[in-house]
UniProtKB/Swiss-Prot annotation:
Intracellular or extracellular location(s): Cytoplasm
Species for this entry: Mycobacterium marinum (strain ATCC BAA-535 / M)
Keyword set, alphabetical order: Cytoplasm, Exonuclease, Hydrolase, Nuclease
Any single biological process term in GO: DNA catabolic process
Signal peptide from the UniProt entry: none
EC identifiers of the protein: 3.1.11.6
Record's protein name: Exodeoxyribonuclease 7 small subunit
């Protein structure tokens, strides 16, 4: 997705699938800040909101993966103790 910088120029945005958890979280925080600040036109606001939704989903995916890794490590540790 590209966001208009109000000069008719666009900034290229990194695909969300390529972002790690911290980068997704930080960008999501920035999206929320921009939306709460207001003053954006409707189209830009909608684009930001849509990107924020995808960022939030990606953060959840990263967290689910981390939870699974911890669960797997704990299960392996318990299996070694038996």
């Amino acid at each position: 997705m590209e966001l208009d910088d109000h000069n008719g120029e666009t900034d290229s945005v990194t695909p969300i699938s390529q972002l790690g958890y911290e980068a997704c979280r930080d960008e999501l925080i920035e999206v929320v800040r921009l939306l709460e600040q207001g003053g954006l036109d409707l189209d830009t606001s909608l684009k930001l909101w849509e990107r924020g939704e995808v960022l939030a989903k990606r953060c959840e995916e990263h967290l689910a993966g981390a939870r699974q890794r911890v669960a797997d490590a704990l299960a392996a540790s318990e299996a070694e103790q038996d």
